[in-house]
Regions:
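Alpha/beta enzyme core
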Residues: 2-219
Length: 219
């Protein structure tokens, strides 16, 4: 067993992810879609993987990322991945599959399965890939309720890092997206995700004005 694997086995997956984020200023996180792709990422010596809803939907049901996969299907995919690898995995929890009560259950089950983190976003259900036209976001209070519910559930003992995503940049502009992300951080989110910055200047502004860890994706 390698020293890296020995360390992982001593820590919970959320704590291991926290340690990685604390120790490194930049962490590449390749996306997986099933147990095999996750194992290949692990064997390539990456520290973390992310179960992409976009990729999982294509792989499992052969359909685009339009909110067609059920929570049960997503959970089954995430559970299989967690059982196959030792590096931490962040699961794409989409909108939480309903209201705040659904978000609580989604987080609880993903935490019990061994996920290190979970993404919860503010799109209107049924959601769609963040890089496609026609998407919309819920109002501020509903968006905040989702992250508040996730934080409350974590504080009840179901440890997991919360990645709070907003798609408001596309529909309401960068200022609204930053404002939502700042509130997500106040509510307990660990990683802030403003979807689809339009250019490098927007990315610089996000890094300057949004607290906590930040993530950007490359499709």
């Amino acid at each position: 067993m390698t020293n890296k694997k020995a360390l992982i086995n001593k820590l919970s997956q959320p704590d291991n992810l926290r340690k990685i984020l604390d120790e490194k200023s930049f962490v590449p996180i390749p996306s997986c879609f099933d147990a095999l792709s996750a194992k290949l990422i692990e064997q390539a010596n990456f520290d973390v993987t992310f179960m992409s809803g976009f990729a999982a939907s294509a792989s499992r049901i052969g359909s685009p990322d339009l909110g067609l996969m059920t929570f049960s299907e997503v959970f089954d995919q995430a559970n299989n991945i967690c059982n196959a690898i030792e590096i931490p995995m962040i699961v794409d929890g989409d909108t939480g599959y309903g209201n705040a009560m659904n978000v609580r259950r989604t987080l609880k089950e993903c935490s019990k399965a061994g996920c290190a983190g979970i993404l919860i976003e503010d799109q209107l259900a049924p959601k769609r890939c963040g890089h496609t036209p026609g998407k919309d976001v819920v109002n501020r209070e509903e968006a905040f309720d989702r992250i508040r519910a996730a934080s409350d559930m974590r504080n009840e003992g179901y440890d997991i890092l919360i990645m709070a995503r907003t798609d408001a940049n596309h529909t309401h502009g960068l200022g609204e997206a930053i404002s939502r992300s700042q509130k997500f951080y106040e509510l307990g989110a660990d990683i802030m995700f403003i979807e689809a910055p339009k250019n490098k200047e927007e990315m610089r502004t996000i890094c300057k004005e949004v607290p906590g860890d930040k993530i950007a994706n490359i499709v």
